[in-house]
Amino acid sequence: GDNDRTYYLQQRWNQMEIDENTPTVGTKLQQAYDMALTTEGLDRAQLDAQRDRLYDFFKMRVLLDKPIILLSSGELRKLKLTETLLTQPRVLIMDNPFIGLDADTRQQLRVLLGEIAQKGQLQLILILSKTADIPPFITHVVEVDHRIVRPKVTLDEYLAHRQPMPDHVLSKKTAEAILNLPYTHKEYNAREVARLNKVSIRYGKRTILKDLDWVVGNGEHWALSGQNGAGKSTLLSLICADNPQSYACDITLFDMPRGTGESIWDIKRHIGYVSPEMHRAYQRDIPALRIVASGLKDSVGLYVKPSDEEMAACRFWMEVFGLKGLEDTTFLKLSSGEQRLVLLARAFVKDPELIILDEPLHGLDNRNRQLVKEVIDTFVKRHNKTLIMVTHYANELPSCIDHHLQLVRHD
């Protein structure tokens, strides 16, 4: 919508852009409530009861005064779900409604949709990329495979004929090519990738992070978890030098204390990064190959012509992620899954010492999720490669994970 068109990557962390006219969760939901009141034959008491239930279901009351641009990706999805269900639609089409939600919220949503389906209140169509996300109340499945629409079958028929995923999707040849890549920053010798001492972050009256101590050693592979709104993306924004509050915190990155003369580019040159916010911020319809190449210089667009060697690296990573043949296809003409794979290729292309993957498997099908996990496992086998990965699905974590930090929400 209009919010997405004016959104940029660091906007969530820049509070100086928030004023009394900035839309909040409460104003957005009030608009949905007012629209629902115009529905013919709808009783106000019934609507009020539905609103109260949705607010309880998705824990929306604590978010009502929060500006929409400050929402985490999971909180934003909960807002959109509440808004949509509040308008009492007769036909509901939901595109991957479970991604970005923590385990408790996913289960609550399954229960809610199951009750709606059982009552026959509306026609429900779910677009899902993960077979495991299909709720048991679904009656029929239509599979789209390589742009071919398969015949409609019952859920039982679909599950009975599913082919098991092979143990390995990444070819041995490609894995060896990744392991044998030349190192970009031969002078890199940081002992610690990140050290945070008693870090606290507040937005208005709400505490996001409180007295957090965290050390990420060189070569470690971390899983970062927590409920929606627990501060995972905020923490990553401090490490990626996207959050202005980092200068007021005791943070050392790559053995360099923040605010001691280093530029954000000194930090970013070592980091490859993918997140839901980054995906949302990419609205430029430029060829996929150019987007991958922009990762070489940490820019949104491509402003410096890459060398032949750099372009070869871009094509290599596009091929790794199954994007060969899509180099000239512009970003907005790709599917959301293909877009995510392009952004992953962009994150890996400069051979970063730290790879930060915030829910990188959003919208990917079963095969591509397996592929990405194998690419991650292979890449971090190399010397001086550190990983921080966020996901709400434990089975999405690659096997290389050897450390875990769980954040707690401070309401």
What are these model-derived regions, one by one?
Residues 1-38, 236-300:
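ABC ATPase nucleotide-binding domain signature region
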Residues 43, 67-71, 303-306, 330-334, ...:
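Conserved ABC ATPase signature
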